[in-house]
Regions:
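Positively charged n-region of N-terminal signal peptides that target proteins for export
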Residues: 1-5
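Hydrophobic helical h-region of N-terminal Sec-dependent signal peptides
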Residues: 6, 10-15
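Terminal disorder- and signal-encoded targeting elements
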Residues: 11, 21-22
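C-terminal motif of bacterial Sec signal peptides marking the signal peptidase cleavage site
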Residues: 16-20
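Flexible loop/hinge segments at secondary-structure junctions
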Residues: 22, 26-327
Length: 327
């Protein structure tokens, strides 16, 4: 069974209108030729093809949120329960590239990156993946963006002071405006301080910090928001150097308070476990904003809407052909 997608419907309609309104032979000939050219450009999607399933690695907070929300908790950390020959993406950007280049692929990405991804975002339980629908509670596939920070800076007192200032900056009107611009979902209540109103609490902000490097990392889904925030804050705090190395949510705690000790600020696209494996110190972590997760397919795919049950059946290997899920 094959579904045909008409990528240039408006153009075809315009040609038909032109042909009906202009009786000249030359115009009619041109219209017919153009119509034939449009027909040759029809994109065909074969639903009898096997679904190519993509996932993130077990270090990913997006994978954690995605699998948990669709009721497939056992797949958060265990690849053995997933469909055979599943492919793994190294990050949010890598997932986007894989789906863009695989006509029969399916995966999941951060809503904050959907608009510029070139992928098709699917409805979830009948609801479009939009910021408005996350805010009104109708779109259920979402999670928080969070941060955690180092608590022992040793002799790096300048870094520690900059990190403390950065955490306070996150609650300002300026920072929240930036997060919203980066598609983070949150409200500005009007009660937030401005940076100017709290800057005097952080003397480090008036110093020349151009030779001080602060290390940021963690979630690849939060990377865009994190980079925008540090780019904004650096000139407000002595032009410190922000070094970003994002390898997944699992590295956020490990890098700041765990065994790796290679980050000063870590970002997560899930909640901290707050167990023995992620025993973050009270007051050293918090929420940035909300972000949704979107199931995505290639633009030529005729699949438009999905459900938790359908996604789970694809990722578990119960359904392997596109015809199994496309009516």
């Amino acid at each position: 069974m094959k579904n045909k997608l008409f990528a240039m419907t408006i153009a075809v309609c315009s040609i038909m209108a032109l042909a009906s309104c202009d009786s000249s032979d030359s115009t009619s000939s041109n219209s017919v030729a153009e119509s034939e050219e449009m027909t040759s450009e029809l994109v065909e999607f074969d639903t009898d093809k096997t679904i190519k399933v993509y996932t993130r690695d077990t270090n990913s907070g997006t994978r954690d949120g995605f699998m948990s929300k669709i009721g497939f908790e056992e797949a958060v950390k265990d690849n053995s329960v997933l469909v055979d020959e599943i492919a793994e993406a190294t990050g949010n950007g890598d997932m986007i590239e894989k789906i863009k280049n695989d006509e029969y692929g399916i995966g999941y990405i951060s809503l904050s990156t959907l608009d510029d991804s070139g992928c098709k975002g699917l409805k979830y339980e009948g609801v479009d993946p939009t910021i408005a629908n996350v805010k009104n509670g109708s779109y259920g596939l979402y999670r928080n963006f969070n941060y955690c920070v180092r608590t022992d800076f040793g002799t790096n007192t300048s870094v520690g002071q900059i990190v403390n200032a950065f955490v306070s900056f996150l609650g300002t009107t300026e920072a929240k405006t930036t997060m919203i611009a980066e598609k983070g979902i949150l409200e500005i209540t009007g009660n937030e301080p401005t940076w100017a109103s709290i800057k005097d609490q952080f003397p480090i902000a008036t110093e020349d910090n151009s030779n001080v490097t602060v290390r940021f990392g963690g979630s690849t889904s939060v990377e865009g928001v994190a980079k925008a925030l540090t780019e904004q804050f650096s000139p407000l705090c002595g032009n410190f150097i922000a070094n970003h190395n994002h390898q997944g949510s699992g590295s956020a705690y490990k890098g700041t308070q765990g065994t790796a000790e290679d980050l000063d600020v870590g970002f997560l696209s899930r909640e901290l476990k707050l167990t023995s494996s992620e025993a973050a110190v009270s007051g050293s972590y918090g929420k940035l904003c909300i972000d949704a997760i979107v199931t995505v397919v290639n633009q030529v795919n005729s699949y438009e809407a999905t459900t938790a049950a359908a996604i789970k059946s694809i990722y578990s290997g119960e359904k392997t052909l596109w015809s199994d899920v496309i009516a």
